[in-house]
């Protein structure tokens, strides 16, 4: 992949056969090191060597350039892993900016300096053109890293959101709109040959990709824009066309680099916000000790289940459980053991719940389970399995529970009525057990 991308990139080398303003291999190489680790460096060295050996220069200059490209990737990977979150650099805006500076601006000076110096020492590039060749080399590598590395990293991740049909249609509409506008600005309209500064027309579609999707889709949208923009600019159309092809590409790459960084940072910031909102919501509806639904969520689910059952005419059941003798456990063995007892009971409840059931901590030593489309008889069977599981548990102290059952609508048609009904059964069970013990 490095070799093929390198040969394609050097087809756009105008200031020198070995220096191109469009250099995707730098991004591919850095992505390979971030994904596979530093052990991937021999492949980069070999690919860079073959690309340059089959293009221009001598064996010595090809080795020098290959060493520079490999060191650039190694330095960039080390800096990103150390200071920018490694492969997670595009999940936070702060790390995205760090990645841009460390990998896109700092590490790229290594390849540009070693590469141009090797060519100049070998007599394949005049020293008078050192600055212009170096600038082209550096910018090509920088934009290649900023644009290609995120794309490869994000698509290699397995943590992808599954799209609904509506989501897929929206993505397709976005891609078509972006391609059409990019074509209008850079390629085939009556406006493109006039070089009007219309590149800003593409930005809303990149914002769309970042706002509605993830950094992965934003990086993909940037690639689509870049492909059309480079094609149009090389054919003499678009706002960045100048007297020489290399000057045109340098201006275009500067624009693409800035747009890429801003789009990826915006997408990362939005992704951060979504994760924070999801985390806050999870904490708001989850019991921090047991990981079960908390009182707030239990009441919300109970109200929702009442509405569903009222529409469908199907009953549902509610189990109310009380962990027996929790105070004695706390007094005799300490609160850590008491907390562990609550977690043990929570694990048992999870094990005997269906995916559609909602187990939760009602408060203190009380738990509840909402059983959709279940009768009181079915709920009693679940209660029996919970009793049996606790009796078989070999961990000390031995746990026992009292359980009350209520069925909608037989025992009540409101949240309060169902809870009172289940609590009456639970209290009666406790009294009966107390009489048996005494």
Regions from the PLM with identified roles:
Residues 1-49, 53, 78, 85-99, ...:
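Hydrophobic transmembrane alpha-helices
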Residues 141, 287-290, 319-322, 364, ...:
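Conserved metal-coordinating catalytic motifs of nucleotidyl cyclase and c-di-GMP turnover enzymes
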Residues 200-201, 245, 250-288, 296-307, ...:
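Signal-transducing coiled-coil linker helices
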Residues 281-300, 321-334, 343:
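Conserved nucleotide-binding and Mg2+-coordinating catalytic segments in signaling enzymes
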Residues 301, 337-358, 366:
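Active-site-proximal alpha-helical element of nucleotidyl cyclase-like catalytic domains
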Residues 345-350, 378-396, 423:
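Alpha-helical scaffold within the catalytic cores of cyclic-nucleotide enzymes
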Residues 358-361, 397:
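A short pre-motif secondary-structure segment
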Residues 391-399, 418-438:
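Catalytic/regulatory signature loops of cyclic-dinucleotide turnover enzymes
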